């Protein structure tokens, strides 16, 4: 499948192993599975398999099933939306919150678009932290700084474990620091979708986030599902959600009354609406097996990809034109160090410039790479805070760009002499030194 091709978009999705597809196919042709909501033998078998994979997946993230639950979702965005809707409904159902229009929400500048979207449920009670220092100042002030939230207001603080744009890894100590604040009613949501691709997510620590979202296709390539991992101590924040779907209620009256009783045996029984994508969940079980067989551990993947990313970073950063000007400008946080998995993931964001310093459209770099059998990603990457920060666009300029016709799917690639997006190269577990060298040769030969 990859002969003569170089895949460098593992941040979008990593590649699935052939053995995973074969094992999954063999499973489906060898067993009869029914809808888990039915009581037949095939359905019972399917339900048991779902339960088994749920526990194994929690263990993959070092999450004790006694203290965590896992709710399957269509992707990480759906998991994030579940938290957002639940906080909105919890706030509306609480008598103590009647005076506040919405729950308070804080999010980091590096947040993916899906995290930023939560702010629309807050009635304006939200705040975007510009950098880590601002987050830490907030912690140290007990939340008073910036007058961020009312003392009685429920809050949610969300951040990505790794920027999907630059690959910079954010501090995972924040949930513990926030939880240590006396009287704090602010919960934490970790977007681990990008981080989990090449880094072990260890939820054994008491400072684990209240909510963690993941995407399995980013880790294993297949299946295309995600999950929300919930600390059971924070689970009550999701239990006031108003919507209920099939399989989440014990009884419901449709005529003459509007009463219903939700399932309360487990958090996932209450929140997984309708029939689960059980075949995809079976595939996840095989993905866990194959991943371990091929790569042994996430720590090995982390070390491998960190080494490759460091080689790639050095290669890109040293490319120059004949007049000495750099070919590429890499967008990197000063505290992030390539080769150090604690601070930097295996992702590089950059733009290419000609010999007089004019940016070459990132779309053209992507197209030329594609023609050469090299698959990367370019654009805004659903990371508006990162784009605004590194490409130095303020809010008024972003609005002006939109008025001029700029769209995420149809970008104006250069505005006022500045690129409006970036080229991103992201490595994965099966990336090789040959992949790195192929891309560097591509840049050398064409720019």
Language-model features: where?
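Pyridoxal 5′-phosphate
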Residues: 1-447
């Amino acid at each position: 499948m990859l002969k003569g091709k170089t895949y460098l978009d593992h941040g979008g999705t990593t590649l699935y192993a052939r053995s995973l597809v074969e094992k999954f196919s063999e499973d489906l042709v060898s067993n009869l599975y029914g809808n888990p909501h039915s009581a037949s033998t095939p359905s019972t078998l399917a339900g048991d398999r779902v339960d088994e994979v749920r526990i194994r997946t929690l263990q993959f993230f070092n999450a004790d099933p006694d203290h965590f639950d896992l709710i399957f979702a269509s992707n990480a965005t759906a998991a994030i939306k579940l938290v957002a809707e639940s906080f909105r409904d919890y706030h509306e159902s609480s008598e103590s919150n009647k005076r506040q229009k919405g729950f308070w929400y804080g999010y980091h500048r590096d947040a993916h678009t899906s995290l930023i979207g939560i702010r629309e449920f807050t009635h304006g009670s939200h705040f975007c932290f510009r950098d880590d220092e601002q987050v830490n100042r907030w912690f140290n002030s007990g939340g008073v700084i910036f007058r961020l939230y009312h003392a009685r207001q429920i809050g949610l603080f969300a951040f990505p474990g790794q920027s999907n744009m630059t690959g910079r890894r954010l501090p995972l100590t924040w949930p513990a620091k926030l939880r240590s604040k006396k009287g704090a009613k602010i919960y934490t949501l970790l977007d681990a979708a990008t981080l989990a691709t090449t880094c072990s997510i260890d939820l054994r620590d008491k400072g684990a986030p209240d909510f963690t979202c993941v995407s399995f296709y980013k880790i294993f390539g297949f299946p295309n599902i995600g999950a929300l991992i919930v600390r059971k101590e924070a689970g009550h924040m999701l239990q006031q959600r108003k919507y209920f779907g099939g399989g989440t209620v014990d009884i419901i009256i449709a005529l003459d009354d509007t009463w219903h009783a939700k399932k309360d045996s487990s958090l996932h029984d209450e929140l997984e609406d309708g029939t689960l994508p059980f075949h995809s969940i079976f595939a996840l079980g095989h993905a866990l097996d194959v991943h371990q067989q091929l790569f042994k551990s996430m720590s090995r993947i982390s070390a491998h990809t960190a080494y490759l990313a460091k080689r790639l970073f050095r290669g890109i950063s040293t490319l120059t034109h004949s007049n000495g000007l750099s070919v590429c400008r890499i967008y990197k946080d000063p505290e992030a160090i390539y080769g150090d998995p604690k601070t930097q993931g295996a992702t590089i964001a950059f733009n290419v410039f000609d010999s007089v310093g004019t940016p070459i459209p990132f779309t053209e770099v992507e197209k030329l790479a594609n023609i050469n059998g090299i698959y990367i990603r370019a654009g805004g990457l659903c990371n508006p805070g990162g784009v605004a920060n590194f490409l130095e666009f303020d809010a008024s300029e972003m609005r002006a760009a939109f008025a001029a016709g700029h769209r995420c799917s149809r970008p104006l690639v250069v505005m006022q002499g500045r690129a409006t997006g970036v080229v991103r190269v992201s490595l994965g577990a099966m990336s090789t030194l040959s992949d790195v060298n192929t891309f560097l040769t591509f840049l050398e030969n064409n720019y």
